[in-house]
């Protein structure tokens, strides 16, 4: 036999203690392995070709009254309550003549828009023509000034025509004066 540890006086062995103390909690519980359960029930799936699965279920069809849809393109008589989804600017006409007058007013307004566009186009064309004429007038004025200057120079030449040196000097002076006005000084940085 195996040697036992010497027991200390005053203390009892642990084996005796366990029996006299609290009862084991595992004894009161039922072991999960020992419990017998009924076998799981097999769920039988039906074949896809079975007639009950192939049948289409009927969906409920709602009437127009149940849905509360307004009737479209209808002339609502006087005294009839307007539908709940009324748009802004919607005009309810009580008779055919009233509807025709409203239609005529709308058409006239649209024609007015078209006429105003045509009128604007005409005005713009007139403005373009006026600008063209002004530009042509300016060019003609410049040409006339240039021609006048040329004529004045020619007249001066004809008056002084006696001395050739003076006329040469005058023409060179006139040319230098014209060049000085036309030519501008330019500065270049190297």
UniProtKB/Swiss-Prot annotation:
Ranges in a coiled coil: 115-161
Disulfide-bond pairs as recorded: none
Record-linked InterPro entries: Loc1
GO terms, biological process: intracellular mRNA localization; mRNA transport; ribosomal large subunit biogenesis
Basic residues compositional bias, start-end: 180-190
Subcellular location: Nucleus, Nucleolus
The keyword Acetylation is annotated on this UniProt entry: no
Low complexity bias (residue ranges): 1-13, 164-179
UniProt keyword list: Coiled coil, mRNA transport, Nucleus, Ribosome biogenesis, Transport
MF terms (GO), sorted A to Z: mRNA binding
Biased composition regions of type Basic and acidic residues, renumbered to the chain: 39-49, 114-154
UniProt region (Disordered), positions on chain: 1-67, 114-190
Subunit relationships: Component of the 66S pre-ribosomal particle.
Protein name per its UniProtKB record: 60S ribosomal subunit assembly/export protein loc1
Organism in which the protein naturally occurs: Aspergillus clavatus (strain ATCC 1007 / CBS 513.65 / DSM 816 / NCTC 3887 / NRRL 1 / QM 1276 / 107)
Biological classification of the source: Eukaryota, Fungi, Dikarya, Ascomycota, Pezizomycotina
């Amino acid at each position: 036999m195996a040697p036992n540890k010497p027991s200390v006086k005053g203390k009892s062995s642990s084996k005796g203690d366990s029996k006299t103390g609290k009862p084991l909690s595992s004894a009161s519980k039922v072991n999960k392995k020992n419990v017998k359960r009924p076998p799981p029930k097999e769920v039988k799936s039906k074949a896809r070709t079975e007639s009950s699965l192939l049948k289409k279920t009927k969906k409920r069809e709602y009437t127009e009254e149940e849905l509360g849809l307004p009737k479209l393109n209808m002339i609502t008589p006087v005294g009839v309550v307007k539908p709940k989804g009324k748009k802004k600017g919607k005009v309810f006409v009580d008779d055919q003549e009233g509807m025709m007058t409203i239609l005529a007013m709308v058409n006239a307004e649209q024609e007015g828009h078209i006429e105003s566009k045509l009128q604007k186009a005409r005005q713009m064309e007139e403005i373009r023509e006026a600008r063209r004429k002004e530009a042509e007038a300016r060019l003609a004025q410049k040409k006339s000034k240039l021609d006048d200057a040329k004529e004045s120079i020619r007249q001066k030449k004809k008056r002084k025509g006696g001395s050739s040196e003076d006329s040469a000097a005058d023409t060179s002076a006139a040319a230098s004066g014209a060049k000085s006005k036309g030519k501008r000084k330019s500065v270049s940085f190297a």
